[in-house]
């Protein structure tokens, strides 16, 4: 550190004590919020962080027809009447995780349209892995300038083997979410094994999925014949 740079100096004290409440993980809650769109029912998420990305995802879910309520770090999502997979740029351009709605919209509605996703500027962060995976599952996708226009034909999404070029967390999550709307099992090779993937798998199991290998880098998911519509608290 240069002499002219600002610095924070921490001095030791005799004792540290007290209690703090840790905020829930944004990286876990956003994909679970996206996956809640798969379910024609209510999902309640506790210890949900009060941050801009969470509220942006809430706005996107409302655009899809969900009823969303947030009060004192508790998020209630009712996707019973959700009927739309076409998003505008009011919220989707504000955060990267908007792309996670591709899997749930294709799985439930068979249609997904979104302008280029936004988010923090951390170098180049293309959505190629997401698009390639959805195509392998059977979606027809076009787009320009980073946006996406996707639909599923009359045969629907079909479970398959997907090998990711890189263990992308977001692409892994999108594969898992989309696989819930596919016929048959899906295997994801070179998948991410980060904790936020584990959390998503826990939620998808509550919807009725059978999942193996989420901590190994190779995941197999078999969707239920009918997604659980009972209220879920997570």
Protein language model features and the residues they cover:
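Structural preference for solvent-exposed beta-strand-turn elements
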Residues: 1-234
């Amino acid at each position: 550190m240069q002499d002219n740079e600002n610095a924070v100096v921490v001095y030791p004290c005799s004792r540290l004590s007290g209690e703090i409440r840790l905020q829930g993980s944004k990286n876990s809650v956003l994909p679970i919020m996206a996956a809640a769109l798969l379910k024609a029912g209510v999902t309640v998420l506790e210890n949900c962080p009060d941050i801009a990305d969470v509220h942006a995802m809430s706005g996107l879910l409302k655009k899809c027809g969900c009823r969303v309520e947030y009060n004192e770090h508790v998020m209630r999502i009712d996707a019973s009447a959700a009927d739309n997979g076409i998003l505008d740029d009011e919220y989707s351009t504000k955060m990267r995780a908007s792309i996670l709605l591709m899997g749930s919209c294709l799985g439930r509605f068979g249609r997904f349209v979104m302008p280029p996703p936004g988010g923090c500027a951390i170098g180049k962060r293309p959505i190629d892995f997401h698009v390639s995976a959805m195509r392998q599952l059977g979606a027809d996708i076009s787009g320009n300038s980073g946006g996406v226009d996707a639909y599923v034909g009359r045969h629907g999404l079909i479970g398959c083997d997907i090998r990711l070029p890189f263990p992308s967390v977001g692409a892994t999550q999108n594969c898992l979410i989309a696989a819930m709307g596919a016929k048959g099992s899906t295997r994801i090779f070179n998948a991410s094994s980060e904790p936020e993937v584990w959390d998503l798998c826990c939620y998808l199991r509550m919807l009725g999925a059978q999942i193996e290998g989420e901590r190994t880098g190779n995941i197999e998911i078999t969707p239920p014949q009918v997604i659980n519509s009972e209220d879920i608290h997570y």
